[in-house]
Amino acid sequence: MTHNLASIIAGRYITNEHLVSSFQTLNKEIFNVLEAGKSVNNLPIYRVDFGTGCYKILLWSQMHGNESTTTKAVLDLLDYIQMNDKQDWLSKFTFCFIPILNPDGAEAYTRVNANGIDLNRDSKDLSQPESLVLRHVFEDFKPNLALNMHDQRTIFGVGAENKPATLSFLAPSFNETRDINETRLFAMQLISCMAASLASEIPGQVGRFDDSFNINCIGDMFTYLKVPTILFEAGHYPSDYEREETRKLVFKSLVVLLDSLLTKSYQKFTYEIYQDIPENEKTFVDVLIKNYETSNDFFKNRVGLPVFFKETLVNGRIEFLPTIDFE
């Protein structure tokens, strides 16, 4: 599996400018790049349509502007499709991909949009133009499957394994009691298939997100509307703060998902297999300083100083600035 875009689309800071560069490499006979709408700051929100099949897949990334790993993987997937002439996918599926839903947040490297709103808490109110763009696309496209692409912080680990949650998934709930219906079970089966494919490559590093119900979250809303939805959370791979290794694993997961839809291999996976994926938990710091000396009463009785890297935009690059935080 090649990643030809890795040389031109890399790092953590990914904006519309990078999208436009990558779009120039796309085969116009396969991909149709459109403008789905505008952001608060009037930046274009792009969508990429391709495929002619009856099964429709909607994907969006960078709903949170500072979560760019999955965007890189999505661009890798587009490149892979044209480089490998994936007619089996193109004839079976119709795709609508929104690589950056929150271009203002991407440019400012913030989770929220230009109005300071978390778009993943706006699925009921639809108070923001970006939320309306996604909802209009959803209602017009009428997907059979929705893929909600995010990043998670380096602090997340998997269960009691003492390993980072390099990739986590969720089949969102559709009600407060977290019941299982056909819609949600289908998402669970696809997730289980992807998790199984990653087991040998990153053993103990695939997690399951908490499934508490919140109708304001887009995945919960779409599942409530009876569209199977899968949350992807790209996390930390050891010594990979630029998330280039994680990018490859997200890409691989998408390939496995699409192949499993073709072959129906997901059908052998059960609810129990999904539940066996351990939940991710906040278990890590970036650096733990021990055996230090200080006269400060607040610090001297601590076992260690927990250091977290604050991702900070500096001159078009993300720098990781150390901060001490006991929260």
Predicted features along the sequence, with ranges:
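Short glycine-biased active-site loop of nucleotidyltransferases that positions the nucleotide triphosphate
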Residues: 49, 108-111, 220-223
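C-terminal accessory segments enriched in acidic
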Residues: 1-19, 141, 170-178, 182-327
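Short glycine- and acidic-rich boundary segments immediately preceding or forming the N-terminal edge
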Residues: 1-45
